[in-house]
A protein has these predicted regions:
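Boundary at the C-terminal end of the N-terminal hydrophobic targeting segment
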Residues: 19-25
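Short Gly/Thr-rich strand-loop-strand
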Residues: 40-70, 86, 95-134, 173-198, ...
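Bacterial N-terminal signal peptides that target proteins for export
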Residues: 1-9
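Short, surface-exposed beta-strand/loop micro-motifs that present aromatic residues
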Residues: 74-82, 125-132, 200-223, 271-273, ...
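Extended intrinsically disordered, low-complexity coil regions enriched in Ser, Thr, Gly, Ala
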Residues: 95-117, 144-166, 226-260, 296-314
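A surface/extracellular/periplasmic glyco- and lipid-processing/surface-interacting theme
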Residues: 138-195
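A short acidic-to-branched-hydrophobic micro-motif
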Residues: 67-107, 138-140, 207-213, 217, ...
Length: 314
């Protein structure tokens, strides 16, 4: 009996160890580089772990945003130049649970399209670097301007991340024509400020329009760029998407206007109208998605871009 009990325990322990190994779980603090650092740099603080309860102690003003995106835990560290003590780099690595949420946080902090060439997508300027890879979002800040050094640290961290999850598939659905690079964002709730749209992606596009040249000749027209947006709202099934479209129609009829124009040529479950704040809008249902374009000037531009979008959605 005693022998049998120990045999069962050993088997259970073996299964547990195998499950842990096969899950690919990586201790978060192991992602902080300690060796092969850029010349003259040393780790002086950390790794320090934060969880959902303690994150506010570290980034009080931004903690709520991270929690909305599914924050699990993070690790913080500080590096220092041995020759110049005030020259430091702070690093934060956030476990966001999955690649969609990691991209979402990254997309909210990226100010413009300045890729650094590390992770699945990245941003790099004189004092800061950020990127996402798998379920991780990484931010680094330098007290002194040195983008090359920021790139080195970012690449060291990216190499330590074994999560090989691809980028969110929805990013590839957005048409390339007229697209403003680096503008796609993911929102876990309240897409476009509408709670009924729930979670989804939005991207910015540029439409060429004629504007009056007020400096040279008031009667002379020139070409300028006007921004508008495409969005993709995600629901659990087609019925929920259809219900959201009905709510959108009711909301638009109260605050703006709904066009009686037929949209049979692009789908029976469709909505066209004008929002008092966001401009002209067209919304279509495709499966468990709602696709839309809003803020465009020319009908042809809005309809063509939305048609491309709908074709790309699988």
């Amino acid at each position: 009996m005693f022998h049998r009990t120990w045999t069962v325990l050993f088997i259970l322990m073996g299964i547990f160890v195998w499950c842990e190994a096969s899950s690919g779980a990586t201790p978060l603090d192991s992602l902080i580089p300690r060796r092969d650092l850029p010349g003259g740099w040393v780790l002086i603080h950390g790794p320090q772990i934060y969880n959902k309860k303690t994150l506010f102690e570290h980034i009080n003003g931004q903690a709520e945003l991270y929690l909305k995106y599914g924050f699990r835990q993070s690790v913080f560290a500080i590096y220092q130049d041995k020759k110049k003590a005030q020259n430091q780099i702070e690093v934060d690595i956030y476990d966001m649970g999955n690649v969609v949420q990691a991209f979402g946080v990254f997309s909210r902090f990226r100010n413009e399209d300045r890729p650094g060439g590390f992770g699945l997508d990245s941003y790099l300027d004189d004092h800061s670097a950020s990127f996402y890879k798998g379920k991780y979002f990484v931010m680094a800040y330098a007290t002194e301007s040195n983008p090359d050094l920021m790139s080195q640290f970012s690449k060291l961290i990216a190499l330590k991340i074994s999560d090989s999850s691809p980028p969110p598939k929805e990013i590839s659905y957005f048409p390339k024509s007229g697209f403003k690079a680096g503008s796609i964002q993911y929102f876990p709730e309240g897409l476009l400020g509408h709670q009924f749209l729930k979670r989804g992606f939005q991207g910015t596009y540029v439409e060429e329009v004629e504007v009056k040249d007020k400096i040279e000749d008031k009667n002379k027209a020139k070409t300028g760029g006007k921004e508008f947006n495409l969005f993709l709202a995600i629901f659990k099934d087609s019925q929920e998407a259809m219900n959201a479209l009905k709510v959108y129609k009711d909301d638009l009829s109260k605050k703006g206007k709904v066009s009686p124009e037929s949209l049979i040529q692009i789908g029976t479950n469709a909505l066209k109208g004008e929002d008092p704040y966001q401009g002209k809008v067209i919304v279509l249902q495709k499966g468990f998605y709602l696709l839309g374009v809003l803020g465009f000037e020319k009908e042809e531009v809005g309809e063509n871009r939305l048609a491309e979008f709908m074709k790309n959605v699988k």
